[in-house]
Amino acid sequence: VGLPTCWDEWFPEVARNYGLRGADLLCYPTAIGSEPDHPQFNTRPLWQSVIVGHAIANGLFIAVPNRTGMEGLIQFYGGSFIADPFGRILAEAPENEEVALVAEIDLAHRQDWLQLFPFFATRRPDTYGKLTDPVTNHRQSDGHGLMGPIPGISAE
């Protein structure tokens, strides 16, 4: 079992490292919600897709408890879920509701996945050089990313 937290869920290297070290299940305790600077932008589908992608790419079961409620300007949207290595959502909480999720996890499905998708054995570490370069600040002082504002999203 691996226990990375919150922000780690956005980085594929974290899930890959746990998968390579033999974890069958990751649990990402999370506090994610609305974006006060972009109130019309819903991050929930992106958040869930990224994590489900980690499950698929690394043959992992992933449980993601997310908080609910309001704190300051942020509305935490809940939507906790459990995914399997094939990208299926095994259990999912409604948005903005606190619930206990339960799902049956058959670890043999991970072994099936490892045989079907030999991603670990066919990796290309010789192409990963940039992954170990020092981190630099990619955020511009105007609050936009390197490529400017998010298309279709206004900061107002």
What are these regions (language model features)?
Residues F61-E156:
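C-terminal beta-strand edge segments of enzyme domains
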Residues C6-L101:
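CN hydrolase (nitrilase-like) catalytic-core segments centered on the catalytic cysteine
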